[in-house]
Design a protein with these regions (language model features):
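Conserved phosphate-binding elements of NTP-dependent enzyme cores
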Residues: 1-954
């Protein structure tokens, strides 16, 4: 009998309360509930962890040491479990060498395609490259300067690992005595020992001769022999001058430029044979930036204008010598110098042997950087450096020879620079002849199919060349989802974490179709999700709760979406059915007459926009993925204001000007990055609560009697902490072929402090007791301490009363980290002139959590502050005072203002996808109780801002 259920019995991981759960196999099942209710504990830390652990245990001990191994979850049993694959939100890769193309493996297929049917062209003149004969190579050599000494060499080994003893012995047997190994001339009869773990290049010297009349016959024989030995390649090296690689296979008839036989590695920017020699395949160089090195262009260079190097007597003396040699006035502000003098000071004299031999300020600093052994000095200079586009490959990462190979008239870099939607069209348009079809038909099919999967999950605006480090968590997750769909596995359990993050409502349907496709292949798809449309389209829903933290971890309801909506105890069901809803403003705020304007925004795909952000209101920036929201708000607005207000060195995206910055005194970006990267960081330390708590304990009579200071109650320094575990509460035991085991410290019992410190109590609680408690409980204990109560209350207000005060920062999801940052800002004194920028703050939030978040944002705004939010959540969009909708599409088809105004005004714009979604909500067709509020009164109707328009400059 076939197993139809995944049965979980007695799940107790984290806050789960010994629950039993049945999950139908081969279904799309959604786990939902409040933040902190135990969703991830059930989906990832219990079900996925056990599935992965069982699979890894089937492998050999040798194989297990290379894999991340999961701890056995706290559960009685799980039956009917399939091999599990987790697709989480974590960023795909931080490596600058990883791109969308490499992580989806589409780039590997492109390398195969271009190496098999690509047409080489001359990188110099653009003509098709043809083969060169031995006679043509002889003519080239004879055209060199008379009496030039040349070596004719044959490449035997090119960039391969090994010792190559047999190859060199064979060369000696054939009468060859010299070769060049890794750039060094060696005698083949010597006992050479090459490191077999490193790449080597071996070129045997076939002949050495002087260019003069009468050597043609000997030269032709030598070239022919070299061709035979080198597989058609001949290297002609003019002693102490340039070297030229000739090929009997591929060479330009006019320029004489030869390229080696095309291989997949010729198109790899991670291989020395394909990578641009200047930037080594990165497409950019991290170098000293003149705009940063000259800290004030309005001042003379030696009087406040120059930053690094200004205190160096050697550099100052060199600059003074340049002044004497070229005759200009050093008292002139740097910006007043003509370009010629600026370039002279920055880059030095254009040729060696100039009047002064000056390297330039940048050259001097580079020289110091290379010679310095001081990490402090290196870190100091990093502040004056920027990533600039490589001047040789212009960001395309590959050698000129590789970039000159074309398929369908496009180079591989041209193809990877296209948005995926257009790359898909280009792949479909490739016409193959009979022979090409045999060679590359399957390759083109794979490329096309994988591009279709990426397009289907809403990533058509990305390019294959997009750096993986710049992808959001949601984009990275959808890329992995597309890769899994492409693998066409069956009988697998897929566990996903909020795949709808970052997706506009327009694209949500395609994502759900992709998940259903994965299910229809014969897989079980388990999704942690809060999105209403996803819950409605699920086959089965598991609702956890009823609260968060210790008040959660119970199975509230399970069944079909209809059964969840009819459940009287399900908070999720109450929101979806309309019994409960998120209230909307009855009247929208009017702007205070002030505004910040971004003029001429042209970064990335923005189309020279003029954008006005009214102050004193909540503005939501909307638009489909890739429409330019993050570029406008994070890359331009935030960086430009941070530069003006805080002298930030981070350069803003391209724009003409920012006006109105004088109307605010602070700009604060509240994102989802971790509040700390070590287990010692926690909400108490981040919000400043811990310092006040330590002061409180230091003031207690027991502490005064013993002479304890606040430092005694820190687990980060010696004195009061447990020295056995260094204040961590646990110790790590290495287990070789098993995962490392963390065991509770046997000295302090996991409490982090020594016995003397723990004996100090406030109202019967030690400081370790408080750190182990939920924030809401600590608030009750410390409610009479004003400076602590206010900060604890803000954590409760943003819906984080369930987290432990001392919970490790590394265990906090992005959504919780963002709300902790929001709570810290709420706890500060408000000036009413602060601009808050938030990027998708509803990530990881249940309907009820969104309600609490909106209450907090309204509080901030009512104090006179301004809030700008990038968001797709319709409840947040409906509660905005002002909407800026970008689009209409993503990538090159985006970057324009589609609509702007109040939600009611945007809802009337027919070409706005956001407007369509708002109209459905206002009309109640979304079947969400929150839509029943209808439109709010237009408090902005009398404002000075136009309701809609493109915002583009003429």
């Amino acid at each position: 009998m076939a197993i139809t259920q995944i049965s979980v019995r007695g799940a107790r991981q984290h806050n789960l309360k010994n629950i039993d759960v049945e999950i139908p196999r081969n279904t799309l099942t959604v786990i939902t509930g409040l933040s902190g209710s135990g969703k991830s504990s059930l989906a990832f830390d219990t079900i996925y962890a056990e599935g992965q652990r069982r699979y890894v245990e089937t492998l050999s001990a040798y194989a297990r040491q290379f894999l991340d191994q999961m701890e056995r979850p706290d559960v009685d049993s799980i039956d009917g479990l399939s091999p599990a694959i987790s697709i989480e939100q974590k960023t795909t890769s931080r490596s600058p060498r990883s791109t969308v193309g490499t992580i989806t493996e589409i780039y590997d297929y492109l390398r195969l395609l271009y190496s098999s049917i690509g047409v080489p062209h001359c990188p110099n003149c653009g003509k098709r490259i043809a083969r060169q004969s031995a006679e043509q190579i002889v003519q080239r050599v004879m055209s060199l300067t008379p009496d030039d000494r040349v070596m004719i060499m044959a490449p035997i080994v090119r960039g391969r690992k090994g010792e190559f003893k047999k190859e060199m012995e064979k060369l000696v047997q054939h009468g060859f005595s010299r070769a060049r190994v890794d750039g060094e001339l060696v005698n083949l009869e010597d006992d050479l020992a090459l490191d077999k773990r490193k790449n080597h290049t071996i070129e045997v010297v076939v002949d050495r001769l002087l260019v003069k009349p009468g050597i043609e016959h000997r030269l032709e024989l030598s070239v022919g022999l070299a061709m035979k030995l080198g597989g058609g390649l001949v290297l002609v090296a003019v002693v102490n001058e340039e070297e030229t690689l000739y090929s009997s296979r591929l060479a330009c008839p006019d320029c004489g430029i030869s390229v080696p036989q095309l291989e997949p590695r010729s198109f790899s920017f991670n291989s020395s044979y394909g990578a641009c020699p200047e930037c080594h395949g990165l497409g950019s160089r991290y170098d000293l930036d003149p705009a940063k090195v000259i800290v004030d262009w309005s001042k003379p260079i030696l009087d406040g204008g120059l930053g690094p190097g200004s205190s160096s007597q050697n550099l100052v003396r060199s600059i003074q010598l340049v002044v004497q040699a070229y005759g200009f006035n050093l008292a002139t502000p740097f910006e007043k110098f003509p370009d010629k003098i600026q370039n002279l000071l920055l880059y030095g004299e254009p040729q060696r042997g100039g009047k002064s031999g000056f390297l330039g300020i940048l050259g001097y600093l580079r020289q110091n950087l290379e010679a310095s052994t001081s990490d402090t000095y290196r870190e100091y200079l990093l502040d004056f450096m920027s990533a600039t586009e490589c001047s040789v490959c212009h960001g395309k990462r590959l050698r000129p020879e590789s970039l000159a190979v074309r398929v369908n008239g496009m180079s591989i870099a041209d193809f990877t620079s296209l948005p995926i939607a257009r790359a898909l069209e280009a792949a479909r348009s490739i016409q193959l002849t009979g022979r090409e079809l045999t060679i590359a038909g399957r390759i083109v099919h794979e490329i096309t199919e994988r591009l279709e999967f990426l397009h289907d999950v809403g990533l058509g605006y990305l390019s294959l060349g997009r750096s993986a480090a710049t992808l959001s968590g949601g984009e990275g997750q959808r890329i992995r989802l597309a890769t899994q769909i492409g693998s066409k596995l069956r009988g697998v359990l897929y566990v996903l974490d909020e795949p709808s993050i970052g997706l506009h409502h327009r694209d949500n349907g395609r994502l759900l179709a992709a998940l259903e496709n994965l299910r229809d292949l014969g897989n079980t798809v388990l999704v942690v999700e809060h999105d209403e449309e996803t819950i409605r389209r699920a086959d089965y829903v598991i609702d956890l709760g009823p609260g968060a933290g210790r008040h959660g971890g119970e199975l509230v309801a399970s069944g079909t979406p209809a059964e969840i909506m009819n459940s009287p105890v399900s908070l999720t069901g109450a929101y979806i059915s309309g019994r409960q809803h998120i209230a909307m403003l009855t009247e929208r705020r009017s702007p205070n007459g002030k505004a910040i304007a971004v003029l001429g925004a042209r970064a990335n795909n923005l189309k020279n926009l003029d954008v006005v952000f009214p102050l004193g209101v909540i503005t939501v920036v909307t638009g489909v993925s890739g429409s330019g929201k993050s570029t406008l708000v994070n890359d331009i607005l935030y960086r430009a204001l941070a530069k003006q207000l805080y002298r930030s060195r981070e350069e803003p995206g391209t724009h003409k000007a920012i006006t109105g910055a004088e109307m605010i005194d602070k700009v604060i970006r509240i994102d989802q990055s971790p509040i700390g990267r070590t287990p010692r960081s926690n909400p108490a330390t981040y919000t400043g609560i811990f310092a006040a708590v330590r002061d409180l304990y230091a003031m207690l009579p027991e502490s005064r009697e013993r002479g304890y200071k606040p430092g005694r109650f820190s687990f980060n320094v010696s004195g009061g902490r447990c020295e056995a575990c260094q204040g961590e509460g646990q110790r790590r035991i290495e287990m070789n072929f098993l995962p490392d085991v963390y065991v509770q410290c046997e000295v302090c019992g996991g409490r982090r402090y020594n016995h003397e410190t723990l004996s100090v109590h406030y109202n019967g609680y030690s400081i370790a007791d408080l750190l182990e408690m939920p924030v809401s409980d600590v608030l009750q204990i410390l409610e009479n301490i004003p400076q602590v109560k206010q900060k604890l209350q803000t954590l409760v207000d943003v819906g984080l009363g369930y987290i432990h005060l001392g919970q490790s920062a590394v265990t906090l999801p992005g959504g919780e980290a963002q709300r902790i940052k929001l709570a810290r800002e709420l706890g500060k004194r408000q000036t009413g002139k602060t601009l808050y920028l938030l990027d998708e703050p509803t990530t990881g939030l249940h309907f009820d959590d969104v309600r609490k978040l909106l209450d907090v944002l309204h509080r901030l705004t009512d104090l006179g502050n301004t809030v700008i939010i990038i968001e797709h959540n319709l409840d947040v969009i409906r509660n905005a005072d002002w909407i800026l909708d970008l689009g209409p599409e993503g990538g090159e088809e985006g970057g324009r203002i589609v609509a702007q105004g109040t939600p009611e005004q945007v809802a009337r714009v027919k070409k706005s996808y956001t407007g369509h979604a708002l109209t459905a909500y206002f009309n109640g067709s979304a079947k969400n109780g929150s839509a029943k509020n209808g439109p709010a009164k237009n408090g902005l109707a009398n404002g000075a801002l136009a309701p809609t328009g493109t915002g583009e400059r003429a």
